[in-house]
Design a protein with these regions (language model features):
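Alpha-helical transmembrane-bundle signature of multi-pass membrane transport and export proteins
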Residues: 1-314
C-alpha cells in the first residue's frame, strides 16, 4: 500500500499547491492597483472563486465517467497512467509561467486539466483498497489514505504560497518543483500491486442504472452521499473564504496567506485518524452526527468572531 500512499500524497499536494498558486497569481494581478477596502476584497474573492470553480467543475463533470473506467480497466493501470499525465500537466504549468509570469489563461487551462486528472484518479485510488486489503483492515486503510490525503492538502496548500513567494521574479520555478514531485509520484505508482479489472461487461448506462438502484435500495448509502456533499461543500467554502480573509482583511503575504487554509486540513486529517482508531474493524456510523455537530459549532464561533491571524489559525 506504500506506493499508493506516496502516489496519492504527491497528487493531492500538486493539486492544492497549483490551485493556490493560480489563485494567488490572480489576486496579485487583480489587486495590484487597489487600496485596502471593499474593492480589494471583492477582487480577491473573484479570483479565488475562479480558481476553485475552474478546478472543481471539470472534476465533478467527469467523475461518473471516471468511475466507469476504473471498473473496466485495472485500477493499477489507471493510477500509473494518471501519474504520467500529472507529470505532463506540471511541466505544462511550468511552461505557462515561463511564457507569462503573471498567470493568465493557460494557468487556468492546466488547472482545469488537473481537475479532470483528479476525477479519473480518485475512484481508482479508493476502489483499489478492497482489492488490496482484507475487509477487517478496510477502515484502518481508508483512514491512513485519508490522513495522507489531508497531509498532502495541508503541505500543498502551504507550499503553494511559499514556493510562489520564494520563486520571486521567476514564478515558473514553483511549478517546476511540482513537476519533480510528480515524477516521484509516478515512480511510486509502479509499486502498487497488480489487480484485475473489477468488471468487464456492461456499458456506461448500465453502470448508471446500477448506481441508481443501489441508492434506492440503501438508505445509509443515500445519507452517506448527502453528508459527503454537505461536508465537502462547507470545507471548500471555508478554505476559499479563509484565503480571501487572509489576503484582503489581514493583509498577509503570499507565503503566509495559505497557512490558515492549510490548518483546516490538519483538523480533517487528525479527525480521519481518530475515526479510524475508534472504528477499529467496523464501520461506525454514529461518529458522523458527532463530527457534524463539531463542524457546525466551530463555524458559528468563526462567524461571530472576527479573529486576527492567531485566532484564525486556532
Amino acid at each position: 500500500m506504500r506506493g499508493l500512499l506516496i502516489a496519492q500524497f504527491c497528487g493531492a499536494f500538486n493539486d492544492n499547491a497549483w490551485k493556490f498558486m493560480v489563485a494567488l497569481l490572480g489576486i496579485r494581478a487583480a489587486t495590484a492597483a487597489l487600496a485596502p477596502g471593499q474593492d480589494l476584497e471583492t477582487a480577491s474573492q473573484t479570483q479565488t472563486t475562479l480558481a476553485m470553480v475552474v478546478f472543481t467543475l471539470p472534476l465533478v463533470l467527469t467523475s461518473f465517467v471516471a468511475g466507469f473506467f476504473a471498473d473496466r480497466i485495472s485500477k493499477r493501470t489507471v493510477i500509473i497512467t494518471m501519474k504520467a499525465v500529472e507529470v505532463l500537466l506540471m511541466a505544462a504549468a511550468t511552461l505557462a509561467l515561463l511564457a507569462n509570469p503573471t498567470g493568465g489563461l493557460w494557468t487556468l487551462v492546466v488547472l482545469a486539466c488537473m481537475g479532470v486528472h483528479s476525477a479519473i484518479f480518485s475512484p481508482a485510488k479508493y476502489g483499489i483498497l478492497p482489492e488490496l486489503l482484507p475487509h477487517e483492515q478496510l477502515a484502518r486503510g481508508n483512514s491512513i489514505l485519508e490522513l495522507f490525503t489531508f497531509l498532502a492538502i495541508l503541505t500543498g496548500t502551504t507550499a503553494g504560497g511559499f514556493l510562489l513567494a520564494g520563486a520571486g521574479t521567476q514564478p515558473w520555478l514553483a511549478p517546476f518543483a511540482l513537476t519533480l514531485l510528480a515524477l516521484g509520484g509516478f515512480a511510486a505508482a509502479w509499486a502498487v500491486p497488480p489487480v484485475a479489472p473489477a468488471r468487464d461487461a456492461g456499458g456506461l448506462f448500465d453502470t448508471l442504472r446500477g448506481a441508481l438502484s443501489a441508492l434506492q435500495a440503501d438508505r445509509l448509502l443515500r445519507l452517506a452521499i448527502t453528508g459527503a456533499v454537505f461536508f465537502w461543500t462547507i470545507a471548500s467554502l471555508v478554505v476559499q473564504n479563509v484565503l480571501v480573509y487572509a489576503k484582503a482583511v489581514l493583509g498577509l503575504s503570499d507565503a503566509l496567506a495559505t497557512v490558515p487554509s492549510a490548518l483546516i486540513s490538519v483538523g480533517i486529517g487528525l479527525g480521519a485518524l481518530v475515526v479510524g482508531r475508534l472504528s477499529r474493524s467496523r464501520v461506525e456510523y454514529g461518529l458522523v452526527p458527532l463530527g457534524a455537530a463539531g463542524v457546525a459549532t466551530f463555524l458559528l464561533i468563526l462567524g461571530w468572531w472576527t479573529p486576527p491571524f492567531s485566532g484564525t489559525l486556532a
